[in-house]
Amino acid sequence: MLRLLFTLVLLALYGPSVDASRDYVHVRLLSYRGDPLVFKHTFSGVRRPFTELGWAACRDWDSMHCTPFWSTDLEQMTDSVRRYSTVSPGKEVTLQLHGNQTVQPSFLSFTCRLQLEPVVENVGLYVAYVVNDGERPQQFFTPQVDVVRFALYLETLSRIVEPLESGRLTVEFDTPDLALAPDLVSSLFVAGHGETDFYMNWTLRRSQTHYLEEMALQVEILKPRGVRHRAIIHHPKLQPGVGLWIDFCVYRYNARLTRGYVRYTLSPKARLPAKAEGWLVSLDRFIVQYLNTLLITMMAAIWARVLITYLVSRRR
């Protein structure tokens, strides 16, 4: 019993910790005006021996198909801190061991640090990983691999240019550091209560306009660099006080490079401009207005006659 209790205490102190970071993505935005970007994570209580630890670039989060660009098994590491240059330019890895490794040789704690130069080539999805047992799999969602996910995205600025009260809603998404490329795909999703959802994927082209029902999508080049996406939505069936969601993304293959998001709520007091109506509706509206005017005139004449009769009777 005491031996079991002692084992449980050792596992609690030095054993692999349950890390909720597998379901969490650490996100950074790329800016050419900033310093190098740093991703890092500390793995605690990693049991030895293990297969390898390292950094990998992932195609997407759904398949977790990742390709390592740096890895080690720590067999050749004698210093507590070492820096490594990777095969990929603009990436540097620092590995730091924690504590006196001779006290508890069966477990290790170390910090993996990845430094990225602020260039668009480094935009993408990354994982710091430890393969605890067996060979490294091609897909990193297996229980034998502990991973921490990171994402470096391009920054997108979202703004509403024309409000819905003008008859159409115009939203612009500016990505200053994005350049046109044949492997980029843009996605736009529009949703709102009482409205049909729109979903469109299209390949980026210079100065193109795409149409889908009552929505127009435009792409233009920004100067000195960057790309602007513009969404124009005509007369959506949206009631006052109800929200409209517009979600914009750009993908390279299945990896998202940037995202813009707008939520617009029509004011409860707003009156949407009416669409063009047929002649029958216009004639019906004219007749109703004419009858209302005639009724008001007749009521005014009756009340005037009653008032005159009352005044004449009082003088007598």
Swiss-Prot record:
This is Membrane protein UL148. The lineage of its organism: Viruses, Duplodnaviria, Heunggongvirae, Peploviricota, Herviviricetes. GO terms for biological process: symbiont-mediated suppression of host innate immune response. The gene is UL148. GO terms for cellular component: host cell endoplasmic reticulum membrane; membrane. Chaperone protein that plays an important role in HCMV tropism. Cooperates with UL116 to regulate the abundance of gH-gL complexes in virion. Favors the incorporation of gL into virions once UL116 has regulated the early folding steps of virion assembly. Interacts with the host ERAD machinery and slows gO decay which would otherwise be constitutively degraded. Reorganizes the host endoplasmic reticulum and activates the unfolded protein response. Additionally, plays a role in the evasion of antiviral immune response by down-regulating cell surface expression of host CD58. The chain crosses the membrane at residues 286-308. It is a single-pass type I membrane protein. It comes from the Viruses. Its main location: host cell. Interacts with host SEL1L. It comes from Human cytomegalovirus (strain Merlin) (HHV-5). Residues 1-20 form the signal peptide. Disulfide bonds: none annotated. It is found in: Host endoplasmic reticulum membrane. Keywords: Host endoplasmic reticulum, Host membrane, Host-virus interaction, Inhibition of host innate immune response by virus, Membrane, Signal, Transmembrane, Transmembrane helix, Viral immunoevasion.
